[in-house]
Amino acid sequence: MKVILYSTGCPICLKLKELLKSKNIFYDEITDIDIMLNKGFDSVPILEIDGKPLDYKQATQWIKERNGN
């Protein structure tokens, strides 16, 4: 499974990053705004799971479901 976090370092991005780390979910982080815009992302954080983008709410739900919490 490929997990990518698109982040600008905003407070919500940092919260999601900490949640991922606390659950030992490995991910790559992309901070290049041009890449985000080219993918059509107009807000962050976005967590991409195997090519499927999730907004913050969806991402936190995915993390909780994946880890049984």
Set out the residue ranges of the language-model regions:
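Non-catalytic, surface beta->alpha helical segment in thiol-disulfide oxidoreductase systems
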Residues: 48-69
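A short beta-strand-loop structural module common to alpha/beta enzyme folds
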Residues: 26-34
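Positions that flank functional sites
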Residues: 34-35, 51
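Local sequence-structure signature of Cys/Sec-based thiol-disulfide redox active-site neighborhoods
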Residues: 1-26
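Polar/charged alpha-helical tracts
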Residues: 21, 34, 61-65
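Short secondary-structure boundary/hinge segments and terminal tails
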Residues: 37-38, 54
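Structural micro-motif
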Residues: 39-47
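Surface-exposed beta-strand edges and their flanking turn/coil or helix-capping segments
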Residues: 18-20, 42, 68-69
